[in-house]
Amino acid sequence: MATNTKMETFVITGMTCANCSARIEKELNEQPGVMSATVNLATEKASVKYTDTTTERLIKSVENIGYGAILYDEAHKQKIAEEKQTYLRKMKFDLIFSAILTLPLMLAMIAMMLGSHGPIVSFFHLSLVQLLFALPVQFYVGWRFYKGAYHALKTKAPNMDVLVAIGTSAAFALSIYNGFFPSHSHDLYFESSSMIITLILLGKYLEHTAKSKTGDAIKQMMSLQTKTAQVLRDGKEETIAIDEVMIDDILVIRPGEQVPTDGRIIAGTSALDESMLTGESVPVEKKEKDMVFGGTINTNGLIQIQVSQIGKDTVLAQIIQMVEDAQGSKAPIQQIADKISGIFVPIVLFLALVTLLVTGWLTKDWQLALLHSVSVLVIACPCALGLATPTAIMVGTGVGAHNGILIKGGEALEGAAHLNSIILDKTGTITQGRPEVTDVIGPKEIISLFYSLEHASEHPLGKAIVAYGAKVGAKTQPITDFVAHPGAGISGTINGVHYFAGTRKRLAEMNLSFDEFQEQALELEQAGKTVMFLANEEQVLGMIAVADQIKEDAKQAIEQLQQKGVDVFMVTGDNQRAAQAIGKQVGIDSDHIFAEVLPEEKANYVEKLQKAGKKVGMVGDGINDAPALALADVGIAMGSGTDIAMETADVTLMNSHLTSINQMISLSAATLKKIKQNLFWAFIYNTIGIPFAAFGFLNPIIAGGAMAFSSISVLLNSLSLNRKTIK
């Protein structure tokens, strides 16, 4: 019995650090029926692949460990957006409230340190006054940390909340002890506990604000989705909500208006700005029968379209979904941070205890020892580790989408930086994929025979012959016993005679001589044209030559890759001479050209290079490229290709420009560099900060501030990718 596998995304609330996301991920993966689950701290989302369970059970499992979960679908998106705004407003209010109460305590402390002992300063140094100001900060504003710490300890997965709760509580408790039960010390630390909470809350608020900017690419794409459409019904034009548009509706789109949804032009011509989908700045000319896509802009002509796709099935919706999935995925390099985050908080708790005991034993000043210990607790930051990789991936995939490069996940984004070999399919990748008949050699009737045979073919060369036949007025004849021979040609019976159309290799297998056409065929192939022969069971009757224009940017793109040290190969089912001619024109070495390759053999060449230690990227656009795309380290599909190719590939180039391959590698390298910088900063910050705190070089307030802003530095570094021009 077939298993019904589902994939759902949930928005997770209540996470504060990498330990939270790791705990939720572990809990989801332990649920019966769950095949895999990943939780992303930066996007605050969980992606769950499951069979025998329900979304309600999954949500309940998250709630049971102290977090919130909401199914991320169309029905809940508005609610999720509203709850996020409410949460941010509440956090902003708490931050302002906390700052108002903390500021007098801080100013009084600074004034006292500067030698001021006036009545106002003395008033704010009264134990009861400080307690009244610090109490709401500690237990109202800081309640979020206590709540988080409770759930973390309950599930035996201590997180940042535990560190903050213990650290600030220790400072607060010491202040109460000194203020109301004085022995030998009257020092109060209410300003320290309050300031730590205020600074950490400020850091969290800025972190949430910065994190929202990492998703700007998604927001920009979502803004392309129109709210209304002009529809023709019963001969009258009316405005309706986009949700009311149905397949086969006729929509009217005026110059300057956005296309509401995908459809085919049935009246009018225009040029459409597709830059938001493809990154291509030049408007694309469109005429009747051409497809247009939702979110694109009609620049000059009035057009009518017949709707073909709506809602989540439109190209724009699928692109948004692909980018969201990519931003929620994990790169292999993140495993380092995940492993460290899992043991980070217990280690910090242990170091804080060691600091307390050793400092107290050496100095005999247990209050000083406690302050050193508090500094260790509040400076340690697992958040920076948790955000280092996902924030860079979010921004990197967003930059890619803006440039027409759709990267499906963190693994592909990281893997592209390591590519040192690229295999290019010829037809539709190096060439335009729109072959045309250039030469017909043989008696006139071969056009009709070719035309009849190729009518049933799906091959691009076959379609070129059919288009030529229609253009010259060829007549189709009834055909029986039609057979497609992958990589070789086609055959069928017409008027009782069995014919074959295809390659010379197939003719040789049939023991047919083509000496009569040998010289002309050689000349055509050396010019880079593909020659197809027509034969019956006795002799070769003639041949047709087909040429496909090389893409304008092909030579430049290949040169760019070679300058990067990437070996470029070409694979094609075409004959050796035609393949070498094309390869020479675009600058591919002759020994890097694989010709006369059957569709099922393309994957073999990928495997061969991989066995030689190469990191291989495969670029293709057809159904027969799918196995090779799947096997490659990074499969790259051209946006003009088949759905199967794009579904199999790790990356889709929406504009079909070969120069986008180089952009993809540059973007991948830049993103990986940011990830490494982020991880380095997070490691160094904790490696240096914790010893400094333990030895008393940082007081708790400075330690808390450093902790708060360490995450911000990681986010800002990731966001700097937005300013990078990828070439």
UniProtKB/Swiss-Prot annotation:
Subcellular location: Cell membrane
One example GO MF annotation: P-type monovalent copper transporter activity
Positions with a binding annotation for Mg(2+): 621, 625
GO cellular component: plasma membrane
Effect of residue 17 to S: Still strongly interacts with CopZ but abolishes the modulating activity of copper
Domain HMA: 6-70
Chemical reaction(s) catalysed: Cu(+)(in) + ATP + H2O = Cu(+)(out) + ADP + phosphate + H(+)
All ranges on the Extracellular side of the membrane: 116-119, 182-187, 363-375, 699-700
Binding site for Cu(+): 17, 20
Topology term for the membrane: Multi-pass membrane protein
pH dependence: Optimum pH is 6.25.
Swiss-Prot/TrEMBL keywords: ATP-binding, Cell membrane, Copper, Copper transport, Ion transport, Magnesium, Membrane, Metal-binding, Nucleotide-binding, Phosphoprotein, Translocase, Transmembrane, Transmembrane helix, Transport
Active-site positions on this chain: 425
EC number: 7.2.2.8
Stretches assigned to the Cytoplasmic side: 1-94, 138-161, 204-341, 397-678, 722-727
Subunit-structure text: Monomer. Interacts with the copper chaperone CopZ.
Function: Probably involved in copper import under copper limiting conditions.
Annotated family: Belongs to the cation transport ATPase (P-type) (TC 3.A.3) family. Type IB subfamily.
Listed name of the protein: Probable copper-importing P-type ATPase A
Organism, as annotated: Enterococcus hirae (strain ATCC 9790 / DSM 20160 / JCM 8729 / LMG 6399 / NBRC 3181 / NCIMB 6459 / NCDO 1258 / NCTC 12367 / WDCM 00089 / R)
Gene: copA
